[in-house]
């Protein structure tokens, strides 16, 4: 889950809660070397919706866009669909709508579902060192407040969700994760890490063990479509991180983003960035909502002075300091 860049590059911290990655979050790349369930195979359209963050307006827009798609299709919420939705009625409405589709749990849902929460994991975000302590502490408190919106029945539904899935769109084999190929809260698909050649070598090794052509992820909250070359010059792999469906992703652009995979090109001009891989069209599909209403709803639950307001409101208004030309990255 995000941060709005109260960042301290190279800093160290004594805080563990919110920075640790619990052992039960781990699965490893080899789990993806399998066939998808019947519902996720032979797809013509796949939406991967990560980081909805309790934004009900964005949820309605995603469902509207998906309803316009044709053919064999599937919508997957890949975690952190809850976060700002501390109103119990809103929380339950979002959960009902999400669970009508395929869903994975993110760190938010996993921590909410814990029947005996402790302070060790905090928000479960496993924040790296470049995220400042203030963001970490506020996220831990947001999670604590969000838990008050849940019931035992709702938490049990979240606990039953898987941490990963496999999907095929056309012949494209996709690993669906919240974090990375190793862990539900891993930051291995963060744009900051993927900018480093040494880290991309690690990601190539994950691909070799996972036997997939692409990973679709979220968690780190900035969008990146990272291309990787393999030992075979004709072989290519991709990491598709949508950033956030329920918050702005780019400077001066208030749209959320979801990753759309399809055997057909996207019509309608809502692609912020796109590539074609193995005959499949992959787009960062814009989720545009009434920004004034979205801000009003956010402020009704998180007014000035609250933790989420301090961490997120400037991003909700102006977007992060991240440019469109940073999204698609090709290896030479």
Which residues fall in each region the model found?
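Acidic, His/Gly-enriched loop-helix segments that form or flank divalent-metal centers
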Residues: 145-280, 289-291
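Residue-level marker for buried hydrophobic side chains located in beta-strands
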Residues: 46-48, 75-77, 103-104, 175, ...
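Active-site neighborhood of divalent metal-dependent phosphoester bond hydrolases
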Residues: 84, 88-166, 197-205
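Active-site metal-binding loops of divalent metal-dependent hydrolases
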Residues: 50-53, 79-82, 107-109, 179-181, ...
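Acidic, His/Gly-rich catalytic cores of divalent-metal-dependent hydrolytic chemistry
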Residues: 2-29, 34, 41, 228-332
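Short, basic, glycine/proline-bearing loop/turn elements
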Residues: 72-80, 141, 183-190
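N-terminal active-site segment of His-dependent metallophosphoesterases
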Residues: 2-97
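Short aromatic-enriched loop/helix-cap "lid" or pocket-rim segments at secondary-structure transitions
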Residues: 114-119, 188-189, 253, 295-297
């Amino acid at each position: 889950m995000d941060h709005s860049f109260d960042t301290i590059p190279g800093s160290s911290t004594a805080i563990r809660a919110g920075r640790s990655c619990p052992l039960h979050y781990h699965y490893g790349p080899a789990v993806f070397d399998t066939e998808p369930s019947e519902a996720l195979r032979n797809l013509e359209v796949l939406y991967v919706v990560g980081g909805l963050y309790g934004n009900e307006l964005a949820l309605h827009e995603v469902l509207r866009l998906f309803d316009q798609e044709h053919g064999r299709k599937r919508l997957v919420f890949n975690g952190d669909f809850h976060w700002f939705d501390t109103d119990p009625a809103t929380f339950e409405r979002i959960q009902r709508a999400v669970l009508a589709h395929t869903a994975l749990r993110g760190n938010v849902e996993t921590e909410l579902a814990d029947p005996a929460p402790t302070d060790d994991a905090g928000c479960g975000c496993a924040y790296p060192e470049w995220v400042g302590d203030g963001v970490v502490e506020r996220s831990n408190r947001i999670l604590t407040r969000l838990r008050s919106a849940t019931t035992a029945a709702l938490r049990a539904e979240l606990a039953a969700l898987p941490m990963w899935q496999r999907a095929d769109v056309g012949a494209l084999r996709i690993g669906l994760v919240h974090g990375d190929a190793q862990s539900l809260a891993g930051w291995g698909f963060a744009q900051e890490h993927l900018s480093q050649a040494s880290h991309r070598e690690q990601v190539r090794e994950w691909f070799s063990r996972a036997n997939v052509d692409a990973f679709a992820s979220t968690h780190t909250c900035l969008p990146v479509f990272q291309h990787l070359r393999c030992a075979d010059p004709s072989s290519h792999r991709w990491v598709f991180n949508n950033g956030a469906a329920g918050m702005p992703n780019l400077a001066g652009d208030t749209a959320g983003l979801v990753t759309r995979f399809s055997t057909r090109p996207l019509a309608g001009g809502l692609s912020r960035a796109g590539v074609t891989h193995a005959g499949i069209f992959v787009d960062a599909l814009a989720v545009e909502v009434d920004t004034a209403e979205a801000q009003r709803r956010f402020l009704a639950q998180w007014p000035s002075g609250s933790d989420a307001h301090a961490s997120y409101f400037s991003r909700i208004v102006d977007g992060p300091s991240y440019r469109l030309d940073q999204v698609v990255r090709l290896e030479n």
